[in-house]
Regions:
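C-terminal motif of bacterial Sec signal peptides marking the signal peptidase cleavage site
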Residues: 22-23
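N-terminal targeting or regulatory segments adjacent to alpha/beta-hydrolase or S9 domains
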Residues: 51-215
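N-terminal cap/lid segment of alpha/beta-hydrolase-fold proteins
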Residues: 200-241
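Short beta-strand element of the alpha/beta-hydrolase
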Residues: 244-254
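Cap/lid segment of the alpha/beta-hydrolase catalytic domain
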Residues: 258-319, 376-377
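Primarily recognizes the serine-hydrolase "nucleophile elbow" in alpha/beta-hydrolase
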Residues: 323-381
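The feature captures the conserved acid-bearing segment of alpha/beta-hydrolase catalytic domains
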Residues: 380-432
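C-terminal catalytic histidine-bearing segment of alpha/beta-hydrolase fold enzymes
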Residues: 427-466
């Protein structure tokens, strides 16, 4: 079934989660004017508005009722563009207190860069408070555009939040920068073989404070492949749950070592909040701070971690995650049918790996998944916070795990300016999934943060790899 796309516009708030077009191929952005008599100062006299909003112009200096910011969006669905098609960004200077207002400024200074290696810079008049920029890309991938309000000397106006936005072209064609290693499955079957010899025995299960009076909570330790690094986390079970009555629900956290997971409760589920690092649960803050600043500082980023991937930090983390699920599958309360995995950022990486490696997962829900397209930078794509690329890092690419996931998957958020979980990486992840799937991209959303005004673009497919 052909995927659909949906655009929604609405107010949003900052929230933590865990964690262009060249002028017809010339490499020069097109300058667009309105009407046959338009001049360069007439740039972008139109922009997308909600049904009830009407443009209100003011010629006074910026005296915002709320906070002044540059708002922007693409003329079309931001993930629908084809390679070579013009991607138009409409930007205007407005106000958090009244979106109808448009403010002038002296100059609008902008920069754009794309996965295909193109870069653009420019300065335009801000007299109208509006700007349209149009670019084209030469290959599938993403583009990032930054626009700043400046004074007549080109200095940034500190009271105005810049616009940073993005778009994707050739969405359906996007794949990882390199192919999946031919021995990917052999590697992981070998690692899982180490777990097969270690039953998930309970080392301790101590009562813990429950956030819900209808649930029992436990701090749990489970034997795993490394006797010195057991599985740890919090388990919650509804009171008076009968044998065979509950779904399994697992929750994985983002990149951090400064805190312990907390008990999570969901009706009809036994929920395990996984501690990624085999740390003790519920210790004092100093215990976690010492680990964050010591043994676990920069974990997973050490080059020696990938000289032999069978000894890497993330390999051991994933094996503990799989062992945690094996423990839950052995519990009498499980209904034997439903397994739900949740996680964002590094938690999304873990959840995807478990869904790929352990049979029986029935639903995967993730957001801003980390470790997607780890080789992207090596072919010139825009990339951000990832370990330095080596071929062995491919053993941990979330996209290659996604290609082995067959259950329904919902990607609740991907940011169009997120260069920790890059837009291109998230597109490759979505394209690799083999089951029913849906993804929602958020314009101007960075890693774990939503913009002042939220615009989303969604794609879904009933099933089958693209």
């Amino acid at each position: 079934m052909k995927g659909f796309r949906l655009v929604r516009i609405g107010l949003a708030f900052f929230c933590l989660c865990g964690f262009l077009l060249s002028g017809c191929g010339s490499g020069i952005p097109m300058r667009e004017t309105i009407g046959s008599a338009g001049t360069e100062s007439d740039l972008a006299q139109t922009t997308a508005m909600t049904d009830t909003e009407t443009e209100v112009r003011t010629d006074q200096p910026i005296r915002a009722k709320g906070a002044a910011y540059l708002y922007g969006e693409t003329e079309q669905d931001a993930i629908s563009y084809r390679v070579g098609e013009l991607i138009r960004f409409h930007i205007r200077l407005t106000d958090t207190a009244d979106f109808r207002l448009t403010y002038p400024c002296a100059k609008l200074v902008w920069h754009a860069e794309a996965d295909d290696g193109q870069n653009w810079n420019g300065t335009d008049s801000g007299d109208s408070g509006r700007l349209t920029l149009a670019f084209s890309m030469k290959a599938p991938g993403s583009i990032r555009v930054t626009v700043e309000a400046c004074d007549r000397d080109g200095e940034k106006l500190g009271e105005v939040q810049p616009f940073v936005g993005g778009a994707i072209c050739g969405f359906e064609q996007i794949r990882t920068g390199t192919e999946c290693p031919k021995d990917f499955d052999v590697f992981w079957q070998t690692q899982l073989g180490e777990l097969d010899d270690v039953p998930p025995e309970v080392l301790y299960i101590d009562p813990a404070d429950s956030p819900n009076p209808n649930f029992r909570a436990y701090s749990v330790g489970i034997r795993s492949h490394d006797a010195e690094a057991p599985v740890t986390g919090y388990l919650t079970i509804p009171k008076n749950a009968k044998a065979g009555s509950l779904k399994i629900r697992m929750f994985f956290y983002g990149y951090n070592a400064s805190f312990s997971p907390s008990p999570q409760c969901a009706d009809g589920c036994m929920t395990f909040a996984v501690n990624a690092h085999s740390m003790e649960n519920g210790r004092e803050k100093g215990y976690y701070a010492d680990l964050q600043n010591g043994a676990l500082k920069h974990y997973g980023f050490e080059a020696e971690d990938y000289r032999d991937p069978s000894g890497s930090y993330f390999r051991n983390m994933i094996l503990r995650d799989v062992q945690a699920l094996r423990f839950l599958k052995a519990m009498k309360e499980w209904n034997g049918k439903e397994i739900l995995l949740f996680g964002g950022s590094m938690g999304g990486f873990q959840a995807t790996a478990v869904a790929a490696l352990e049979p029986g997962v029935t639903e995967l829900s993730v957001f801003i998944v980390w470790m997607c397209d780890v080789s992207g930078r090596s072919i010139g794509r825009l990339a951000g916070w990832l370990p330095d690329y080596t071929e062995n890092l491919n053993c941990f690419d979330s996209v290659f795990f996604a290609a082995r996931v067959t259950c329904p998957t919902v990607i609740t958020q991907a940011g169009l300016i997120d260069y920790t979980a890059t837009p291109t990486g998230m597109a490759a992840y979505y394209n690799a999934l083999r089951g029913k799937k849906q993804i929602t991209f958020v314009q101007s959303a960075d890693h774990g943060l939503s913009p002042i005004r939220r615009v989303t673009y969604s794609e879904s497919q009933e099933g089958g790899k693209r």
